[in-house]
Curated annotation (Swiss-Prot):
Function: Cleaved by the protease thrombin to yield monomers which, together with fibrinogen alpha (FGA) and fibrinogen gamma (FGG), polymerize to form an insoluble fibrin matrix. Fibrin has a major function in hemostasis as one of the primary components of blood clots. In addition, functions during the early stages of wound repair to stabilize the lesion and guide cell migration during re-epithelialization. Was originally thought to be essential for platelet aggregation, based on in vitro studies using anticoagulated blood.
A GO CC term assigned to this protein in UniProt: extracellular region
This protein's domain notes: A long coiled coil structure formed by 3 polypeptide chains connects the central nodule to the C-terminal domains (distal nodules). The long C-terminal ends of the alpha chains fold back, contributing a fourth strand to the coiled coil structure.
Subunit structure and binding partners: Heterohexamer; disulfide linked. Contains 2 sets of 3 non-identical chains (alpha, beta and gamma). The 2 heterotrimers are in head to head conformation with the N-termini in a small central domain.
Entry keyword set: Adaptive immunity, Blood coagulation, Coiled coil, Disulfide bond, Hemostasis, Immunity, Innate immunity, Pyrrolidone carboxylic acid, Secreted, Sulfation
PTM comment text: Conversion of fibrinogen to fibrin is triggered by thrombin, which cleaves fibrinopeptides A and B from alpha and beta chains, and thus exposes the N-terminal polymerization sites responsible for the formation of the soft clot.
Name this polypeptide is given: Fibrinogen beta chain
Modified residues (Sulfotyrosine): Y6
Length: 21
């Protein structure tokens, strides 16, 4: 599972992506 490894990064990037969009 990639998300498991990038759980924290995904959460941080997810917010940035949503904000950017």
């Amino acid at each position: 599972q990639h998300l498991a490894d990038y759980d924290e990064v995904d959460d941080d990037r997810a917010k940035l992506h949503l904000d950017a969009r």
